[in-house]
Amino acid sequence: SIFGNIKRRVEEGRWEPNGGSWIEPDCNIPSGESLTRHFLYGQSFLKEELDYRADQFWMPDVFGYSASIPQILKLCGISGFLTTKLSWNEENRFPYDTFLWSGIDGTQVLTHFNTSHCWPDPETLVAQTMDIQHKDIQDTRLCSFGYGDGGGGPLTEMLEAAPYLK
């Protein structure tokens, strides 16, 4: 089964589960209780099925962020946050790639904002590397490739190109 193959890859250290929440939740309207339960159920599933506990929250495709997220993440044992949607602004460029996000109670969580999706070709990778805003603290960028909206994942061409880009 596909899930059986994933379990084997996790055991081999070749697949790192991420996220820690049950699904990628809406973060504009739900209460803190709702967000906390996403982590309770998500982390429980990862522990029961994969003997794994996520310490990074990967939330690439939401349209808003509750100011309580840093506090909720820390209380749920999550120490880092990765997102992409802050780049969907044509007027104001967000000034940071990597930063400490302070929640409404002052709790901070290390946050990385990946500014774009990636087609794994040399031109795109060079352009994205040149676009890193704070090279003194970050000199590489995650290349999250594939098509996420509506599913689909990476194209065959993307997977075939990846080994040549090391």
Task: Locate predicted features.
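Catalytic-domain carbohydrate-binding cleft regions of carbohydrate-active enzymes
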Residues: S1-K166
